[in-house]
Structure formats: structure tokens, C-alpha cells
Design a protein with these regions (language model features):
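A short, structured loop/turn motif at beta-sheet edges
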Residues: 65-69, 94-100, 122-129, 157, ...
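Active-site scaffold segments
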Residues: 62-65, 133, 150-152, 226-232, ...
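Beta-strand-rich N-terminal accessory domains
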Residues: 1-71, 75, 196-212, 250-261
């Protein structure tokens, strides 16, 4: 069985890579690729559209506290931990068809709690929508958790965004908890209060609107070759700034839809 699952058609669809973090490895719209693809030697954080679980963005010093205990995560970005424990892990394929797949994995040894995550991806070739659903479940104990997605959209393209506020970040690109009026780009910043759904407009006038029930968005447009629009269930360093607690009875579930027009 192939590790790459192709959904939809050549004109509109996506591919999901089970070996590399259950990420979208391809997004095809009007027959053209819209995501940065894999190249030999590329960092696992630098291509496709990958799930970020159980944290999104940086965790300061890779350290957080929960119920009176301090935990240390493995560091994978200098002095900090970033983007979770499963974006570079192999996932199991639970089911697959020509338009839908479900993948699952545990959060692994790099996470101090027993927990699992599923990623469902569905393609609607008529409405031209790719829908992704992440669900993270604690196995026994309570734990903090975040989910999100990190799409790398290929340039040439431009962003259309409108947010009420952005977090103030420090020299480590980590929010300090304060918010301010959004500044002009370029950005590597977390925004809240979306007044409209973010949109990526490609040079051939294809428009991809990103809809999500996540209430935080990281916008990263500093690279020359790509734009990143990242829906997240909380801010970077969210275990400290805005912890969301998951229990065996209350999993965390969020959705992202990529809508092409």
C-alpha cells in the first residue's frame, strides 16, 4: 500500500502523505500545484500543509506546567520546541477512498501524556473544497493540547487578510501575551479577531479561502518562495498563555477548509 494517498482529480484534488506526518503533500487547483513540495534534504517543517499537534508554533524553552508538574519537551528550534510531535512521524491509514481518507497516530514518546490524534481529509471536486479535521484525544489523564495546520502556499501569490488584533512578540518570535493593532508586514505573527476569512490569491487569479473554527491565525510571509496561513486553536506558547485542557471525555477537534474559486 502506498504511503501517499491521492484524492480527487488531476484538475482539483490533494495528496496526503502518511509517512511524513499525514500532511497534504500536494494541492492541485486548475491543474497546477499550489503547495511547496518535498525536496531531498528539506526540513520537515518547510513543505506541504502539515498538522501541528499537540502544540502549534513555539513552546518557550520547550517547557510547560500542568497540574503542578513541569514538563520538558525535546527542543527542535534552537532553545525552543515547535509545531508538535507528529509532523515528521508516520501515521496509520485507517480508511481511504477516491475522495476521503482518515489517518491516525499516537503523540509518541516526545509527548509526556498518552494520547492519540486523527486527521480526516475530504475532497469535494464539485464545490472545489478540501476539508481537514483534526481530533486529539487523551487516553487516561488530562493534558493541555493545541491543534493547527501549517500550509506552505507557493508564490507568486498575495494575501488578503483583515484582523482586529495581533499578539506582541519578543525577539524569539514568541507572543508575550499582550495584543496590539496589526502592523504592516512582512509577518511572522499571530492574529485574532478575523473580520473575514483569510485568502490567498495566485498569479493566475485562482483564489483559495481558508475557513476554520480555529480562532488564532499565524501569518508567515517572510520567505520569497511561499506564504503561510496557519489556523491554530490557540497562540504560540499557548500552554502558558491560554491553555486548553483535554480529557478522555472531551477531545479537541478543529476543522480547516481550503475553498478554491
Amino acid at each position: 500500500m502506498s504511503n501517499e494517498i491521492h484524492l480527487g482529480t488531476a484538475a482539483f484534488g490533494c495528496s496526503v502523505d502518511a509517512l511524513h506526518g499525514a500532511r497534504l503533500s500536494s494541492l492541485r487547483i486548475a491543474g497546477r500545484e499550489r503547495l511547496v513540495g518535498f525536496t531531498r534534504g528539506a526540513a520537515a517543517t518547510s513543505w506541504g500543509a502539515y498538522p501541528m499537534v499537540p502544540y502549534a508554533g513555539r513552546v518557550r524553552d520547550g517547557r510547560f506546567s500542568h497540574e503542578g508538574t513541569t514538563y520538558q519537551l525535546p527542543l527542535n528550534l534552537g532553545e525552543h520546541a515547535i509545531h508538535g510531535t507528529v509532523f515528521d512521524a508516520p501515521w496509520s491509514i485507517i480508511d481511504r477512498s477516491s475522495t476521503h481518507t482518515t489517518l491516525a497516530t499516537s503523540l509518541g514518546r516526545r509527548w509526556p501524556f498518552a494520547a492519540n490524534v486523527t486527521h480526516e481529509v475530504t475532497v469535494d471536486t464539485v464545490e472545489r473544497v478540501v476539508t481537514c479535521i483534526l481530533t486529539v484525544s487523551a487516553s487516561s489523564a488530562t493534558m493541555p493540547a493545541q491543534v493547527g495546520w501549517h500550509p506552505w502556499f507557493l508564490r507568486p501569490a498575495k494575501l488578503e487578510i483583515d484582523f482586529a488584533e495581533m499578539y506582541v512578540r519578543d525577539e524569539h518570535h514568541i507572543p508575550n501575551g499582550h495584543r496590539t493593532v496589526p502592523s504592516a508586514g512582512p509577518w511572522d505573527d499571530c492574529f485574532v479577531g478575523a473580520r473575514r476569512d483569510p485568502r490567498v490569491v495566485f498569479s493566475d487569479d485562482v483564489r483559495v479561502t481558508i475557513e476554520s473554527d480555529c480562532d488564532h491565525w499565524v501569518i508567515y510571509d517572510m520567505p520569497q518562495h511561499a506564504l503561510c496561513v496557519e489556523p491554530q486553536s490557540g497562540p504560540p506558547d499557548g500552554f502558558t498563555l491560554a491553555p486548553h485542557i483535554v480529557t478522555p471525555e472531551t477531545p479537541l477537534r478543529r476543522t480547516m477548509s481550503l475553498i478554491a474559486r
